[in-house]
Amino acid sequence: AAFEGVAFALRAGLDAIRDADRRDPVATLRLAGGGSVDPRWRQLLADALGASLHAIDCPNAATRGAALLAGVAIGHWREDALHALAPAASPVAEPRDDRALAARRARFVDLYARTDAWFTTGV
């Protein structure tokens, strides 16, 4: 349940991104870090996010990403050069139609919506 809660929270963020730009459905995502090696977590994420997942083929992806962003920030690289500098990624999970997971996500969304007032009214 804890892992599903994390996956559903990530889906909420992804839905906000998708809603902000309807032209780009964000159908593929890249994973990095320790969790990206566990096939059960990858599949849960793919199913919950409704996206294909690709694992970054780089053991220090977070450090590399930070260095690339810093390089852009100081003008060493232009943003459009990042694609060529990004490490390769291998497909690791495709989303499945998991009706039981979808039902649990619907409950999560409903319960989360009920708590919204706690954060907007200070109750």
What are these regions (language model features)?
Residues 1-123:
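Glycine/Thr-rich phosphate-binding loops that ligate phosphate moieties of nucleotide
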